[in-house]
Amino acid sequence: MEESVNQMQPLNEKQIANSQDGYVWQVTDMNRLHRFLCFGSEGGTYYIKEQKLGLENAEALIRLIEDGRGCEVIQEIKSFSQEGRTTKQEPMLFALAICSQCSDISTKQAAFKAVSEVCRIPTHLFTFIQFKKDLKESMKCGMWGRALRKAIADWYNEKGGMALALAVTKYKQRNGWSHKDLLRLSHLKPSSEGLAIVTKYITKGWKEVHELYKEKALSVETEKLLKYLEAVEKVKRTRDELEVIHLIEEHRLVREHLLTNHLKSKEVWKALLQEMPLTALLRNLGKMTANSVLEPGNSEVSLVCEKLCNEKLLKKARIHPFHILIALETYKTGHGLRGKLKWRPDEEILKALDAAFYKTFKTVEPTGKRFLLAVDVSASMNQRVLGSILNASTVAAAMCMVVTRTEKDSYVVAFSDEMVPCPVTTDMTLQQVLMAMSQIPAGGTDCSLPMIWAQKTNTPADVFIVFTDNETFAGGVHPAIALREYRKKMDIPAKLIVCGMTSNGFTIADPDDRGMLDMCGFDTGALDVIRNFTLDMI
């Protein structure tokens, strides 16, 4: 545990003296950039609903480039990308597009060099190109210069033939851009035979590739690549169910390779299920039950249950308890969010999802910080959370369980007529936690109370998290003041996160205090935001 720091000394280089001679956790432009890369906004609020990206969202990023720190910005973009610290890819790709079109030469060069690292799949590359097109007018610059052509050519040339074939046949186009467009505009010269085959396939089609290579002596690699491309073409033209299944099994074709018609076949889905990644499996449980791929007692149900209960698979796919909970609640309802698809939930799968929920707690990495969670227990917490199928009390209970089970030092309290302890222990089930919360008489949600209570009771906490619906009433003391008082009294650089889970917008966080964050709604991205914020990465 870090030693506590006197409030009168800077907590780290990120703190600057304020006029009262105390220390406020100042937000620097680099912090603002980190927030933008993580969730698309430089401010202190995480919104679930999609925010439109424009230059006005990235003022700190532009200031950093103007201050000669553009190469540092590129380094941060690469770090966020490699370490998977972003809730969505768009802000990071937008930032890279800005850097690649700015007037600073070294920033520009570093941005183009980073394209292959940051744009890991074709979808990212297409999105990056579209952002460049969107920015062309406002940044008053050209687009298709030599540097971009080289960056695109390198993106294709750095991949092996087989890897590129997999990528271009799975992710064909996005935002109006296709591989054919990019190859035409970049004047690519393939660096290997494998790449020459794939690029010819993209620009001229399978027929020409087949004609060119049918008489040639082929290496094992080339033969494998041609067979794969042939399978991708064959599957597009066949209506024979058995042939589709054979091609899926032999060449590991995925859903994106198939026609809509193929997906009406139960047997085709059974073939896809064999190699289906866990995230796709969780997404498709309802669909596969609705179309009778999963029927009580069949071998497919056994396979699904086996995958869901495999701790190694859960860890490898980085499945969080929250992901499982969403899948479980969605599956349990027996219909899709828009209500068209309907199914009868399978009992064995429900049991497996329930077991997986508890297994995935082991895959969550502790942060090593001290947490104080304050939960709103009012009846309005039964409302549906923005961005989720879950209600607010279920999200709050699940998050209390995650923290209690993974962090050594945590405390849960509830808003009653005063702050009261809410007993959440590591051996409790979700139902037991919800029951414990429902038995506490509800009081008003005054977001300053957790800090006031912790100060009174001398409870040390690095991070306060308030879980409420949209009641973020501030009492006589503003939460920002209560937090600063707590920091001063306890000598702890504490942070505050307020999750207004059914709220479209509220403002509690002081935008100039780096240790405060508001969250409107709650989704799987919110988990990354909380983790990054706790660990000082944003």
From Swiss-Prot:
Q: Which residues carry this modification: N-acetylmethionine?
A: 1
Residues forming the TROVE domain are 16-369
Q: Does the keyword Glycoprotein apply?
A: no
Q: Where is this region: RNA-binding?
A: 120-284
Where in the cell? Cytoplasm
Residues engaged in binding a divalent metal cation: 378, 380, 445
Q: Which GO terms describe its molecular function?
A: metal ion binding; RNA binding; U2 snRNA binding
* Residues with the N6-acetyllysine modification: 224, 359
Instruction: Note the SUPFAM superfamilies from the entry.
Output: TROVE domain-like, vWA-like
The lineage's top-level taxon is: Eukaryota
Q: Which InterPro entries match?
A: TROVE2, TROVE_dom, TROVE_dom_sf, vWA_Ro60, vWFA_dom_sf
Q: Where is this region: VWFA-like domain?
A: 361-538
In the record, the note on similarity to other proteins reads:
Belongs to the Ro 60 kDa family.
What role does this protein play? RNA-binding protein that binds to misfolded non-coding RNAs, pre-5S rRNA, and several small cytoplasmic RNA molecules known as Y RNAs. Binds to endogenous Alu retroelements which are induced by type I interferon and stimulate porinflammatory cytokine secretion. Regulates the expression of Alu retroelements as well as inflammatory genes. May play roles in cilia formation and/or maintenance.
Entry text on domains: The horseshoe-shaped TROVE domain is built with 7 helical HEAT-like repeats, and is closed by the VWFA-like domain giving rise to a ring-shaped monomer. Single-stranded RNA is bound in the positively charged central cavity.
Q: What is this protein called?
A: RNA-binding protein RO60
